[in-house]
């Protein structure tokens, strides 16, 4: 098995896997990482493919938690469910308490479990939830934002989906001289922002496309939205296809938290309580570790793994973020204006 290393957030988060494509929220770098680079990460998640037939036998006498199997204090959790005929869906979680988290799934789970359906979550969702929990356990918080730095100021741009946060950062970087940090997701300790630059939701914007075919596809998506769900070769360009490596920053001290709203109103300063409420709401919409069946079942057998404590830590870190930055509400009916409005607001 050819295991490869990927660092998705420098010195913070990495993943080891043999899969060619990692379908999780933190993205996938264009290049693999060395052992030295992956070992510098505070958190390394491992994803492995195996039949898990031997593990199924080991858990035959374990306690049941719906389709999950575990034992009190055991740093392992097993999932098994009938698929069709004699085939099974299987997943094994282990290493959470030891700080070496690993998810092992069989090929059926990888192939047939897509998205979130009731309590059945894809491996990408499971990996994202696990990574979020591991980050929070180390006083770090995933942040659903885009981010850029310009003239000594570093901005986290937070907004509901499809409002314009990605477009704002990409316009600021490509047209207004800003340095890139993240376009959809980052990590924060409440003071600094750590880049997760390998997501690629910016590929859906016409002006950033690099081929006539891709531009045509983007226009069709606006007319027929379900086309977005159909994969297209060449639609996964990474950020360094658009921006030079030296203009991609990995860590900066945050100075501004900006929340976007698609409505008239211009720019105004938010009070800290209102800003925190909005940031928490938007972060909770994106990250669902609190509702993860896998983590919930694991915490049943390992109550010291307290999901509610992780939620409080998220609130504490984001409260620190709001207290440490100037918080702005930027409002416009035209999302292409957001970047200029943000920069003007930051300079005042």
Segments from the language model and where they lie:
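Conserved glycine(s) of the Walker
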Residues: 163-165
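A conserved segment at the C-terminal end of the G1
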Residues: 167-179
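A noncatalytic interaction/capping subdomain that flanks phosphate/NTP-handling catalytic cores
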Residues: 1-158, 175-176, 188-348
């Amino acid at each position: 098995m050819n295991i490869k290393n990927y660092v998705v957030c420098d010195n913070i988060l990495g993943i080891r896997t043999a899969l060619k494509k990692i379908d999780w929220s933190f993205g996938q770098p264009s290049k693999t990482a060395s052992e030295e680079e992956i070992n510098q990460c505070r958190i390394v998640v491992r994803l492995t493919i195996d039949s898990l037939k031997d593990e199924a036998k080991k858990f035959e006498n374990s306690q049941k938690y719906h389709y999950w199997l575990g034992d009190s204090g055991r740093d392992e959790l097993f999932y098994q469910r009938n698929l069709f005929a004699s085939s099974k869906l299987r997943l094994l979680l282990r290493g959470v308490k030891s700080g070496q988290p690993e998810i092992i799934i069989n090929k059926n789970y990888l192939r047939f479990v897509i998205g979130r359906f009731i309590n059945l979550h894809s491996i990408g969702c499971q990996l994202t939830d696990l990574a979020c929990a591991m980050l929070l356990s180390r006083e770090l918080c995933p942040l659903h934002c885009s981010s850029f730095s310009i003239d000594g100021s570093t901005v986290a741009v937070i907004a509901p989906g499809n409002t314009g946060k990605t477009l704002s950062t990409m316009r600021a970087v490509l047209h207004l001289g800003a340095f890139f940090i993240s376009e959809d997701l980052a990590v924060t300790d409440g003071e600094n922002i750590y880049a997760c630059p390998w997501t690629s939701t910016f590929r859906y914007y016409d002006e950033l496309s690099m081929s006539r075919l891709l531009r045509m596809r983007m226009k069709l998506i606006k007319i027929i939205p379900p086309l977005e769900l159909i994969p297209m070769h060449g639609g996964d360009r990474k950020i360094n296809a658009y921006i030079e490596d030296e203009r991609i920053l990995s860590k900066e001290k945050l100075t501004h938290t900006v929340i976007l709203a698609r409505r008239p109103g211009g720019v105004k300063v938010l009070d800290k309580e209102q800003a925190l409420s909005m940031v928490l709401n938007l972060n909770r919409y994106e990250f669902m570790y609190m509702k993860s069946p896998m983590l919930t079942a694991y915490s049943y057998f390992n109550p010291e793994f307290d999901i509610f404590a992780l939620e409080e830590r998220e609130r504490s870190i984001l409260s620190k973020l709001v207290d440490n930055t100037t918080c702005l509400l930027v409002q416009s009916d035209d999302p292409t204006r957001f970047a200029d409005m943000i920069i003007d607001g930051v300079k005042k």
